[in-house]
Amino acid sequence: MASGADSKGDDLSTAILKQKNRPNRLIVDEAINEDNSVVSLSQPKMDELQLFRGDTVLLKGKKRREAVCIVLSDDTCSDEKIRMNRVVRNNLRVHLGDVISIQPCPDVKYGKRIHVLPIDDTVEGITGNLFEVYLKPYFLEAYRPIRKGDIFLVRGGMRAVEFKVVETDPSPYCIVAPDTVIHCEGEPIKREDEEESLNEVGYDDIGGCRKQLAQIKEMVELPLRHPALFKAIGVKPPRGILLYGPPGTGKTLIARAVANETGAFFFLINGPEIMSKLAGESESNLRKAFEEAEKNAPAIIFIDELDAIAPKREKTHGEVERRIVSQLLTLMDGLKQRAHVIVMAATNRPNSIDPALRRFGRFDREVDIGIPDATGRLEILQIHTKNMKLADDVDLEQVANETHGHVGADLAALCSEAALQAIRKKMDLIDLEDETIDAEVMNSLAVTMDDFRWALSQSNPSALRETVVEVPQVTWEDIGGLEDVKRELQELVQYPVEHPDKFLKFGMTPSKGVLFYGPPGCGKTLLAKAIANECQANFISIKGPELLTMWFGESEANVREIFDKARQAAPCVLFFDELDSIAKARGGNIGDGGGAADRVINQILTEMDGMSTKKNVFIIGATNRPDIIDPAILRPGRLDQLIYIPLPDEKSRVAILKANLRKSPVAKDVDLEFLAKMTNGFSGADLTEICQRACKLAIRESIESEIRRERERQTNPSAMEVEEDDPVPEIRRDHFEEAMRFARRSVSDNDIRKYEMFAQTLQQSRGFGSFRFPSGNQGGAGPSQGSGGGTGGNVYTEDNDDDLYG
């Protein structure tokens, strides 16, 4: 099946999911013949399967549904297809294009009696005998095979009625012959109950965790269906599976699907329900559950929220919990060989479970059901939207690419939110008081891409609910100047997210950290926001001082939590503002509570280096005191790119002014270039302040003139008819001139000198401006940051004073 070029590891891990190609596997196609008991195949296929016209066959569909039908030949049908009508498809729970298997079923007996009941909403208002009008003509002389649980549709006397086969004798299938007794007494079956069984969860309803599903299938289905396999190879089949992962990824759903698809007896234990106030009763509840499952083997016991009943024994204070853990251990590993009982458990805190439970023989397989990637999210969206009416413009792939860090539950919420938005748009046509809603309105409802966009703006991933992560609304246009810095940043964050293949090609892991330093008010924070917005990554902003708390050890725990969250919501930009407050040089902090700041730094250092390379997590630090930051954080591999953000030069100042006044009406004669020339040494924040003040003055003038006008109107009503134009249509020169009177510089020359010096020393200790390889052709080598690695002796000759041990 798989080509030899495939890497073998991937192949085998999901081998169980592959459909085996067998001649009796056929693709479902729409029927021409509308009969409920007939399926048609092509003649060559019938010969291959050794079937004859009129044979009874057994069809197997999804979720272990079966149906018995009569097979006919149809020359228009292609070899690999099978034609069946809607009724048979519903009984098999399949759609057009799905694959079913067919096998001959020669030993179907004639039925002695069958019991059928109508479904209530199809018989409303029908008086008279159902049997005479519907059932008798349907079964007369037809010799139809039926199976218990089937639903069939009978047309007759103006309308169609659906019946369900409740009981057959002999069970489970038989042929209705002329002497079969047909009962149809009893209450009609409610449509709701029927729908519920239709909506059982199967493997198709789970998206985004193929590998995990394969693992679970081989753990559960192989021992239950073919225990001989394990006997032949001489090992005991595995007993326990522990599913863990963040909330909302579908752990309980997988267990339900496994139960429905395998047909094993399914016993659900909710963790907290076991507990009882009487001594010894909690343990006996557990024992009962296991006994019940053993009676009904093969069985699956599913323990939801395992951490509630099996916490670590040394941590718990209650005696009951300890006894329950011990009881669970002995049950899972009892002396008597447990017959075909598989225990599955789900939790989202695998590390708070008693370690004795996690050894081989108890919960020996731990399946991590993680946050899905883009293809997984697309699968999940397709599952959730398969019953939705989507407009043509909906692009689910795009939605999947934009929902970073969302789990299945978040995507389900997203779909329902989009659907609600579609309904809200039609709200003016819907009257709540009416009994029914107009059919036209119902048919015109469809979910458009705009609804999805709106829902996207509302939803954020549940893993990040408490640290509110929002993609900021700042774009590159909002930032004037700094072109080189922008390019550098794009390379840092956007390339690894958008072109990971290039990094693979050149064999490099992308760098993960940047430190902005420079005088206050030059747009360091703004840059970090813009980069998060541009590449649609999640953005967590951490204010330095918030991490420090008064409790011993809590500050470090905060750091750990933040990094964990970022990993879950990757791609993610972690932005440490005011880095100098938490990453001061270690050792000098006298009077600091028990050295908390030092421990926080150590934690940050280990987190930055222990970042798993798979995840796209970027760290951006910003500070205006680079001289007091611990040097260990500045080494390559942590914050390896140090970017100095200087005060803007004249060109940048023009750009900043333009960016600030993008949305404001400015008079034509305001000369921004001249303004930029005059404001030498001003930071970006100072320029923004000038613009704000000019706007404020214009607003003040406009409001005052309106008040004046109002007064005039009251004194002279006849002047009202004349429409006057806006008194202050734009920001004029005099507003800027007035604003310039209050303008001030926030960064003194002295400070600037300090930053320049720091940047200078960094450049010197890091780069080799004049470095060339000793060959004939002069390779292009500019001053490269942080590339002083492979140049052995040069380090000591150029700047000896910088070396500690020189």
UniProtKB/Swiss-Prot annotation:
Q: Which residue numbers mark the cross-link Glycyl lysine isopeptide (Lys-Gly) (interchain with G-Cter in SUMO2) in this sequence?
A: K8, K18
Q: Where in the cell does this protein reside?
A: Cytoplasm, Cytosol; Endoplasmic reticulum; Nucleus; Cytoplasm, Stress granule
User: What is the top EC class of this enzyme, as a single word?
Assistant: hydrolase
Per the record, residues carrying Phosphotyrosine are Y805
Binding residues for ATP 1: P247, G248, T249, G250, K251, T252, L253, N348, H384
Renumbered to this chain, region (Disordered) spans 708-727, 768-806
Query: Which spans are transmembrane here?
Result: none
Question: Which residues does this entry mark as bearing N6-succinyllysine?
Answer: K668
Q: Which UniProt keywords apply?
A: Acetylation, ATP-binding, Autophagy, Cytoplasm, DNA damage, DNA repair, Endoplasmic reticulum, Hydrolase, Isopeptide bond, Lipid-binding, Methylation, Nucleotide-binding, Nucleus, Phosphoprotein, Transport, Ubl conjugation, Ubl conjugation pathway
What PROSITE patterns does the entry give? AAA
| Phosphothreonine: modified positions | T436
List compositional bias (Gly residues) regions by residue number: 777-793
- An example Gene Ontology cellular component term from the record? cytoplasm
Tell me where in this chain the PTM N6-acetyllysine is found.
K502, K505, K668, K754
Described function: Necessary for the fragmentation of Golgi stacks during mitosis and for their reassembly after mitosis. Involved in the formation of the transitional endoplasmic reticulum (tER). The transfer of membranes from the endoplasmic reticulum to the Golgi apparatus occurs via 50-70 nm transition vesicles which derive from part-rough, part-smooth transitional elements of the endoplasmic reticulum (tER). Vesicle budding from the tER is an ATP-dependent process.
Q: What does the annotation say about its assembly with partners?
A: Homohexamer. Forms a ring-shaped particle of 12.5 nm diameter, that displays 6-fold radial symmetry. Part of a ternary complex containing STX5A, NSFL1C and VCP. NSFL1C forms a homotrimer that binds to one end of a VCP homohexamer. The complex binds to membranes enriched in phosphatidylethanolamine-containing lipids and promotes Golgi membrane fusion. Binds to a heterodimer of NPLOC4 and UFD1, binding to this heterodimer inhibits Golgi-membrane fusion. Interaction with VCIP135 leads to dissociation of the complex via ATP hydrolysis by VCP.
- What name is this protein filed under? Transitional endoplasmic reticulum ATPase
UniProt source species: Bos taurus
Q: Coding gene?
A: VCP
